[in-house]
């Protein structure tokens, strides 16, 4: 089992750790966070307003974080180059601070003995992988990779299925997205984009997202054919993608449902889900899929122009994919 270090114990850092313990697929051996001391880590890991209390044991013992009886080394370094990952036995590092998202910055982890780095965010220059879409293109010469964004992980599997069967001529995506830590609780300053600084709990906020364009990086045939935007809405978790696209081959909506359902039960099982139930956002809290197609919510204008809806737990689904990507990478060592 691959030994993993986590840099940044925020929403994704903590949930990747939860996903690792839930799945037993990877071994968390070290955590670095300069802003959270050991006893605070115990508290933050144990209690979660969104996903509930951790179903297991967590305590501090001999200067280590002990989860389900497993001792985890704790570092509190601000500079990634100073984290002694090698000493803790960490081979892979999940870079989940949201700060060190370029090859150069994330590469600092290699200095401390890490063999590979997985950036839990989109990256300007690191190769991006989406499980179920282009993970097979990974090869072990790559030391630094990105798991793309939660929204790209939702959109790409759906876009792949639709494009493989019917061809996407062009498409626009809107994600109706839950609040995240970058937003403000009440109106406050936001450097580049003024609207982003408005109170998260009281507004629908139009925002930018690179998620749709990023699909073109993981599915090259769709490069330049998709773009999109976001609405940030006052919910704590779970988001939904609305993909409106023009199809090359004509397709009845029932045919689209059929191919998505087949994919969800076959090659994309566990990644792309499918439901015909009358669901709402809360129904996907703590769901581990990257994307769940909502068959009843989509509409077709005609055989070439459709709107497709897919839900995702933007925290937990994504965190589970980070774990899956590491498992896949470890299989190529």
From Swiss-Prot:
<dbReference type="InterPro" id="IPR036291">
    <property type="entry name" value="NAD(P)-bd_dom_sf"/>
</dbReference>
<dbReference type="GO" id="GO:0050661">
    <property type="term" value="F:NADP binding"/>
</dbReference>
<feature type="short sequence motif" description="[IL]-x-C-x-x-[DE] motif">
    <location>
        <begin position="243"/>
        <end position="248"/>
    </location>
</feature>
<keyword id="KW-0808">Transferase</keyword>
<feature type="modified residue" description="N6-acetyllysine">
    <location>
        <position position="59"/>
    </location>
</feature>
<keyword id="KW-0810">Translation regulation</keyword>
<feature type="modified residue" description="Phosphothreonine">
    <location>
        <position position="175"/>
    </location>
</feature>
<dbReference type="GO" id="GO:0006006">
    <property type="term" value="P:glucose metabolic process"/>
</dbReference>
<dbReference type="GO" id="GO:0042802">
    <property type="term" value="F:identical protein binding"/>
</dbReference>
<keyword id="KW-0539">Nucleus</keyword>
<feature type="binding site">
    <location>
        <position position="180"/>
    </location>
    <ligand>
        <name>D-glyceraldehyde 3-phosphate</name>
    </ligand>
</feature>
<dbReference type="GO" id="GO:0051287">
    <property type="term" value="F:NAD binding"/>
</dbReference>
<dbReference type="GO" id="GO:0061844">
    <property type="term" value="P:antimicrobial humoral immune response mediated by antimicrobial peptide"/>
</dbReference>
<comment type="subunit">
    <text>Homotetramer. Interacts with TPPP; the interaction is direct. Interacts (when S-nitrosylated) with SIAH1; leading to nuclear translocation. Interacts with RILPL1/GOSPEL, leading to prevent the interaction between GAPDH and SIAH1 and prevent nuclear translocation. Interacts with CHP1; the interaction increases the binding of CHP1 with microtubules. Associates with microtubules. Interacts with EIF1AD, USP25, PRKCI and WARS1. Interacts with phosphorylated RPL13A; inhibited by oxidatively-modified low-densitity lipoprotein (LDL(ox)). Component of the GAIT complex.</text>
</comment>
<feature type="modified residue" description="N6-acetyllysine; alternate">
    <location>
        <position position="192"/>
    </location>
</feature>
<dbReference type="GO" id="GO:0008017">
    <property type="term" value="F:microtubule binding"/>
</dbReference>
<feature type="modified residue" description="Deamidated asparagine">
    <location>
        <position position="153"/>
    </location>
</feature>
<keyword id="KW-0206">Cytoskeleton</keyword>
<dbReference type="GO" id="GO:0035606">
    <property type="term" value="P:peptidyl-cysteine S-trans-nitrosylation"/>
</dbReference>
<feature type="modified residue" description="Phosphothreonine">
    <location>
        <position position="209"/>
    </location>
</feature>
<feature type="cross-link" description="Glycyl lysine isopeptide (Lys-Gly) (interchain with G-Cter in SUMO2)">
    <location>
        <position position="184"/>
    </location>
</feature>
<comment type="pathway">
    <text>Carbohydrate degradation; glycolysis; pyruvate from D-glyceraldehyde 3-phosphate: step 1/5.</text>
</comment>
<dbReference type="GO" id="GO:0017148">
    <property type="term" value="P:negative regulation of translation"/>
</dbReference>
<feature type="modified residue" description="S-(2-succinyl)cysteine">
    <location>
        <position position="150"/>
    </location>
</feature>
<feature type="modified residue" description="S-nitrosocysteine; in reversibly inhibited form">
    <location>
        <position position="150"/>
    </location>
</feature>
<keyword id="KW-0488">Methylation</keyword>
<keyword id="KW-0007">Acetylation</keyword>
<dbReference type="GO" id="GO:0005886">
    <property type="term" value="C:plasma membrane"/>
</dbReference>
<dbReference type="GO" id="GO:0005811">
    <property type="term" value="C:lipid droplet"/>
</dbReference>
<dbReference type="GO" id="GO:0004365">
    <property type="term" value="F:glyceraldehyde-3-phosphate dehydrogenase (NAD+) (phosphorylating) activity"/>
</dbReference>
<feature type="modified residue" description="N6,N6-dimethyllysine">
    <location>
        <position position="332"/>
    </location>
</feature>
<feature type="modified residue" description="Phosphoserine">
    <location>
        <position position="146"/>
    </location>
</feature>
<keyword id="KW-0963">Cytoplasm</keyword>
<dbReference type="GO" id="GO:0035605">
    <property type="term" value="F:peptidyl-cysteine S-nitrosylase activity"/>
</dbReference>
<feature type="modified residue" description="N6-acetyllysine">
    <location>
        <position position="252"/>
    </location>
</feature>
<feature type="site" description="Activates thiol group during catalysis">
    <location>
        <position position="177"/>
    </location>
</feature>
<feature type="modified residue" description="N6-malonyllysine; alternate">
    <location>
        <position position="213"/>
    </location>
</feature>
<comment type="function">
    <text>Has both glyceraldehyde-3-phosphate dehydrogenase and nitrosylase activities, thereby playing a role in glycolysis and nuclear functions, respectively. Glyceraldehyde-3-phosphate dehydrogenase is a key enzyme in glycolysis that catalyzes the first step of the pathway by converting D-glyceraldehyde 3-phosphate (G3P) into 3-phospho-D-glyceroyl phosphate. Modulates the organization and assembly of the cytoskeleton. Facilitates the CHP1-dependent microtubule and membrane associations through its ability to stimulate the binding of CHP1 to microtubules.</text>
</comment>
<dbReference type="GO" id="GO:0019828">
    <property type="term" value="F:aspartic-type endopeptidase inhibitor activity"/>
</dbReference>
<feature type="modified residue" description="Phosphothreonine">
    <location>
        <position position="182"/>
    </location>
</feature>
<dbReference type="GO" id="GO:0050821">
    <property type="term" value="P:protein stabilization"/>
</dbReference>
<feature type="modified residue" description="Deamidated asparagine">
    <location>
        <position position="223"/>
    </location>
</feature>
